[in-house]
Swiss-Prot record:
Compositional bias segments (type: Polar residues): 57-76
Residue numbers bearing the Phosphothreonine modification: 50
Pfam family, one: KH_1
Protein localization: Cytoplasm
The keyword Transmembrane belongs to this UniProt entry's keyword annotation: no
PTM description: Phosphorylated by pmk1. Phosphorylation causes enhancement of the RNA-binding activity.
Annotated protein name in UniProt: RNA-binding protein rnc1
GO biological process, one term: 3'-UTR-mediated mRNA destabilization
Species name: Schizosaccharomyces pombe (strain 972 / ATCC 24843) (Fission yeast)
Domain KH, chain residue ranges per copy: 93-157, 178-243, 320-385
Cysteines joined through disulfide linkages: none
Length: 398
C-alpha cells in the first residue's frame, strides 16, 4: 500500500489542479495561460518531523504505490535529511502560486500576452494565469521552475506592478513604494513558514524587513491559505526566497493539496452528505478544462508530490492505495456520527475502507483515520470527510 499522511483542515471541499494551456486574446482579462510544470524536489530521505509522506524501505511515493505493503497501525519511522546550502536550494524545483486581482492579472499578461511571454523567456520558468470569469475578481498565477528562477520571475512581476501603479498623491511609484503580494500556501505547509510559536515567520520578517500576514482560514473549497507580504520590491524579493526554501524543506507535506479555483464556488455546487445520491453523483468535481476542452490530468498535486490517476478503463483492476489522515480531536465525533451512522454512510458511498485509531497518535491529540481503496474511491471518501468537517464548522459558528 502507498501511504500518504496529512492533516485535514476544517473547511475542505474539493480538489482543484488548475493549470491552463496558453491562449492569448486581444483583451488581457480574457486571456488564458498556464504552467504545466509541476514542482518536484529530489530529496534523499524525508525528515522525521514530517508525517506527510509515510514511506517504507526508503522508497519514493511512486515506488511505494506499486509495491504496496499491508497497512499497519504505526506510522513507519523516517530518517532525517541533510541540510542544503543556498546553491542547492537555488536548483530545487518549486511551484509557487499567487492570488491576483483581475487588474493585476491583466498587467502580468500584457497586451496580446506580451508581458507573460517576456516573463517566461527572461526567467526560464513556466508561468500561467487562470482565465477570467464573469463576476469573479480573483485569478491565480502559477509559476514553476528552479527556486532561483521562480524568485526572479516574481521579482519581474513585482517590477511590472511598480511600473503600472501610482502613489496615492498621483505620482509614479518606484522600487521603494510599499506594495503587497498574496501567495497561496497549502494549509499543511503553513506551519513550515510560521514555525513553532511564530518564530520562523518572525525571523523572515526581520531578515527581509517586510511584514507578513498569514490567513487563519482556507480559501473556499480548497486547502490553500494566503500569506500576504508587505514591503518594497527588494523586501518582497528576499521574502519569496526564504518562503521558497521553507516549502522545499517540507515539500512532502504538500501532497493532497486541494487547489483554490476561483471558478469552483460558482460553477460546482457541493452535494449534501445526507442525500441519497449514488456514488457517481457525489464524486468529486472533474478536473478543470483548458480552452481546448481537454481535461487537465489529475495526477498533479502541489509542491512536487505525485499520485497515480485513476484508470479510465474499468475492466482493469485498479491498485489499492492507503492514506493516513489526522482529524482534530474535537471533530472526530461529527465524522463518526451517532452510532457510527455518518462514517458508515461515507464508507458505503465512497467504497473505501475507513478505520479509526482508538487513541491519539501524537501530542496534538489528533486521531488517525486510515482510508484504503482505489484512487477514485479515496477521492470520494476524502471529499465527503472534508464536506462533513465544513458542515460541522458552519454549525458551530452559528
Amino acid at each position: 500500500m502507498a501511504y500518504n499522511h496529512f492533516s485535514i483542515p476544517k473547511n475542505i471541499e474539493e480538489k482543484e489542479n488548475s493549470f491552463f494551456d496558453v491562449t492569448f486574446q486581444d483583451e488581457p482579462d480574457e486571456t488564458t495561460s498556464t504552467a504545466t510544470g509541476i514542482a518536484k524536489v529530489s530529496i534523499p530521505t524525508p525528515k522525521p518531523s514530517t508525517p506527510l509522506s509515510t514511506l517504507t524501505n526508503g522508497s519514493t511515493i511512486q515506488q511505494s504505490m506499486t509495491n504496496q505493503p499491508e497497512p499497519t497501525s504505526q506510522v513507519p519511522p523516517i530518517s532525517a535529511k541533510p541540510p542544503m546550502d543556498d546553491a542547492t536550494y537555488a536548483t530545487q524545483q518549486l511551484t509557487l502560486r499567487a492570488l491576483l486581482s483581475t487588474r493585476e492579472a491583466g498587467i502580468i499578461i500584457g497586451k496580446a500576452g506580451k508581458n507573460v511571454a517576456e516573463l517566461r523567456s527572461t526567467t526560464n520558468v513556466k508561468a500561467g494565469v487562470t482565465k477570467a470569469v464573469p463576476n469573479v475578481h480573483d485569478r491565480v498565477l502559477t509559476i514553476s521552475g528552479p527556486l532561483e528562477n521562480v524568485v526572479r520571475a516574481y521579482r519581474f512581476i513585482i517590477d511590472i506592478f511598480a511600473k503600472n501603479s501610482t502613489n496615492p498623491d498621483g505620482t509614479p511609484s518606484d522600487a521603494n513604494t510599499p506594495r503587497k503580494l498574496r501567495l497561496l500556501i497549502a494549509h499543511s505547509l503553513m506551519g513550515s513558514i510560521i514555525g513553532r510559536n511564530g518564530l520562523r515567520i518572525k525571523l523572515i520578517q526581520d531578515k527581509c524587513s517586510c511584514r507578513m500576514i498569514a490567513s487563519k482560514d482556507m480559501l473556499p473549497q480548497s486547502t490553500e491559505r494566503t500569506v500576504e507580504i508587505h514591503g518594497t520590491v527588494d523586501n518582497l524579493h528576499a521574502a519569496i526566497w526564504e518562503i521558497g526554501k521553507c516549502l522545499i524543506d517540507d515539500w512532502e507535506r504538500g501532497a493532497g493539496t486541494v487547489f483554490y479555483n476561483p471558478v469552483s464556488r460558482l460553477t460546482q455546487p457541493l452535494p449534501s452528505l445526507a442525500s441519497t445520491a449514488s456514488p457517481q453523483q457525489v464524486s468529486p468535481p472533474a478536473a478543470p478544462s483548458t480552452t481546448s476542452g481537454e481535461a487537465i490530468p489529475e495526477n498533479f498535486v502541489s509542491y512536487g508530490a505525485q499520485v497515480f490517476p485513476a484508470t479510465q478503463m474499468p475492466f482493469l483492476q485498479q491498485p489499492k492505495v492507503t492514506q493516513n489522515i489526522s482529524i482534530p480531536a474535537d471533530m472526530v465525533g461529527c465524522i463518526i456520527g451517532r452510532g457510527g451512522s455518518k462514517i458508515s454512510e461515507i464508507r458505503r458511498t465512497s467504497g473505501s475502507k475507513i478505520s479509526i485509531a482508538k487513541e491519539p497518535h501524537d501530542e496534538t491529540g489528533e486521531r488517525m483515520f486510515t482510508i484504503t481503496g482505489t484512487h477514485e474511491e479515496n477521492e470520494k471518501a476524502l471529499f465527503l470527510l472534508y464536506q462533513q468537517l465544513e458542515m460541522e464548522k458552519d454549525r458551530r459558528s452559528h
